[in-house]
Amino acid sequence: MANVVVIGAQWGDEGKGKITDLLSRSADVVVRYQGGVNAGHTIVVDEKVLKLHLIPSGILYPETICLIGSGTVVDPKVMLKEIKMLKDNDIDISGLQLASTAHVTMPYHCVIDAAMEERRGLKKIGTTGRGIGPTYADKSQRNGIRVIDLLDERKLREALEIPLAEKNELLEKIYGKEAIDKEKIIEEYLEFGRLIKPHVVDCTRIIHKASRNKKNILFEGAQGTLLDLDHGTYPFVTSSNPVSGGACIGAGVGPTLIDRVIGVAKAYTTRVGEGPFPTELKGKINDQLCDRGGEYGTTTGRRRRCGWFDGVIGKYAVEVNGLDCLAITKLDVLDELEEIKVCTSYELNGEKIDYFPSSAEDFGKCTPIFKTLPGWKSSTANCRHLEDLPPPAMAYLRFLAELMEVPIAIVSLGASRDQTIVVEDPIHGPKRALLSS
């Protein structure tokens, strides 16, 4: 038995969906532990492209239990659309389960999210506009609506009474928007409750039962370390905790239940939205990475900002998450480059530093110090073993492993499942990897 957490080691969009899908074949339970529909992952199966925002990647394996945990925020409209899409593609969803205690994103959350971002003007954060922040804010203020409330009209009416009155006053008097009709919401969300009721469970109880029965449990994070509310580039962050510690809170397990933490990182770096990004590229190479990597957000469709691999934030992610190993994705995107740069440290106010500054203002002033490595100018897309890789590609991976001081267990060379080199099975293999320092 092994219980594994999969986290993003950068700013999200690292390819966690593919890695989780790969590991899910060995998992009995897959748990999404935080975030909402602001996250998106793309999975390619039999040339079909499936884009999911809420439902865990493990849903593609019919024997796997897929839990949407208590730490998530759920938009039932999106969940039902994803259920329909999966059914239309003949995918068995009988293993899909939703925590009764997860909070629900309501229509007013989305309206307020967009209005707040509009009001910020030039100081905007770059939110997806999906209502995630306002949903988590209501949760913290104990004004939230939970999944269990959608199953009982009396509970839903009581739960809506105070927050909806407050939100309507805010919408009308501060943002100049129309008030939201209470009866319409109640009717609509009771129907959502009726439709999702077969999937609603006590999430924590199921996880602990699986643990007692020595099952393999995979905890799937959304977004990435540098978007963590407490440990990211605040305020340009998400409203939850994507780091490995968030798995304990969002799934309701103790840290001793976690056996291993896998960090997923691209062979370069991307970021969506606002906020500092020291290794960001402009011009031809940026366009090349964006086009070859298909760097457009699954959730927003926004073009991602691209840059060289940043080893400083990488080492920070190793420390914050307690990473045991890495999965490096999109190595093939670098195939046509003459040379490749890796940030090994920063210069801040004339001083060389090798750590991630806690101030976003200081981080924005950091100038990257690069190590230049030769490119390989040949395709890696069909490589299936380490020895198939061009020597410069192997050298690049070894350099990343040495810089991050953590072994590489998986290398992804494309979107398809078979475009993967598994150096070590992170669930069943020994706690080591062959490609290491």
UniProtKB/Swiss-Prot annotation:
One of its GO terms (biological process) is 'de novo' AMP biosynthetic process. IMP binds at D13, E14, G15, K16, N38, A39, G40, H41, T128, R142, Q223, T238, R302. It is found in: Cytoplasm. One of its GO terms (cellular component) is cytoplasm. Mg(2+) binds at D13, G40. Its cofactor is Mg(2+). Pfam families: Adenylsucc_synt. Homodimer. This is Adenylosuccinate synthetase.
